[in-house]
Swiss-Prot record:
It catalyses: 6-(2-amino-2-carboxyethyl)-7,8-dioxo-1,2,3,4,7,8-hexahydroquinoline-2,4-dicarboxylate + 3 O2 = pyrroloquinoline quinone + 2 H2O2 + 2 H2O + H(+). GO terms for molecular function: pyrroloquinoline-quinone synthase activity. This is Pyrroloquinoline-quinone synthase. The gene is pqqC. Belongs to the PqqC family. It comes from Cereibacter sphaeroides (strain KD131 / KCTC 12085) (Rhodobacter sphaeroides). One of its GO terms (biological process) is sulfur compound metabolic process. The keyword Oxidoreductase applies. Pathway: Cofactor biosynthesis; pyrroloquinoline quinone biosynthesis. PANTHER family: 4-AMINOBENZOATE SYNTHASE, PQQC-LIKE PROTEIN. Ring cyclization and eight-electron oxidation of 3a-(2-amino-2-carboxyethyl)-4,5-dioxo-4,5,6,7,8,9-hexahydroquinoline-7,9-dicarboxylic-acid to PQQ. Gene3D superfamilies: Heme oxygenase-like.
């Protein structure tokens, strides 16, 4: 499932300015973001069965419910109050607030609509091992690397609105079991992701002051694209090629 991306990026060069770094970041996104993955092409093009879509939503839930954990870790890395305040809204975006639903609630509306038992989804017992390992690696990254790299790893949000728009239109067009209500998560992220990406980009442009720091920012983005890509590789291997590991969710048509 891996694509050869070596020819998609310009040759390595010192990043002598914030503009050069941003150009490099956008090259990385164009070449490595998971909108290029064959599993997403199948998902958005109506080529998956209901059971395969269930498997995707079930596994992706683990990523969604871990995002606020990751963001709490990011907040804990900063002594700067202004940065903590800015980042704090991300927790409410996903966890919700009193009287207001969040992204996790909206994702569960999707899994409910797909016919998955909510308690089973929330237990995460049916997810693929690779899903768990990839998502946990992301949390470890923001905990163990520099605060600058922790923020830089979130820069995949620069490229998220396009995939959300494609997903909304594609899935509504191709699947009779998909409706606007269950796609509410992606609709909300059309406005949330650009706001978050703008802040993260401003932050790394201001705080990555040396070529080495700018390279670290770019490598953090590469790492995050690998986290996302690995999850799709695992889904394709299990639910398209049919190699479901023991203990993982098995769609009805594969039983």
């Amino acid at each position: 499932m891996s694509l050869d991306l070596s020819t998609s990026l310009s040759p390595a060069r010192p990043l002598e300015s914030a503009d050069a770094m941003e150009e490099r970041l956008r090259e990385i996104g164009a070449a490595r973001y998971h909108d290029r993955h064959p599993f997403h092409h199948m998902l958005h093009g109506g080529e998956l069965t209901r059971g395969q879509v269930q498997a995707w939503a079930l596994n992706r839930y683990y990523y969604q419910c871990t995002i606020p954990v990751k963001d709490a870790v990011v907040i804990s890395r900063f002594r700067d109050r202004a940065t903590r305040i800015e980042w704090r809204h991300r927790l409410e975006d996903h966890d919700g607030a009193e009287g207001a639903e969040g992204g996790i609630d909206r994702w569960l509306i999707l899994t409910d609509g797909l016919g998955l038992d909510r308690a089973y989804v929330e237990s995460t017992e049916g997810i693929l091992p690779a899903t768990r390992f990839a998502v946990e690696a992301y949390v470890h990254f923001v905990r163990d690397r520099s605060p600058l790299e922790a923020i830089a790893s979130c820069l995949t949000e620069l490229f998220a609105p396009n995939i959300h728009a494609t997903r909304i239109s594609g899935m509504l067009s191709h699947y009779d079991f998909i409706n606007p209500t269950v796609m509410a998560y992606f609709q909300r992220r059309l406005t949330q992701a650009p706001r978050d990406a703008d802040y993260a980009l401003r932050y790394v442009r201001e705080h990555a002051r040396t070529p080495e720091e700018r390279a670290a920012v770019c490598n953090a983005l590469i790492f995050k694209t690998q986290v996302l890509w690995t999850q799709l590789d695992a889904l394709h291997h299990a639910y398209v090629l049919g190699h479901v590991p023991p203990g993982a969710f098995v769609p009805e048509e594969m039983r």
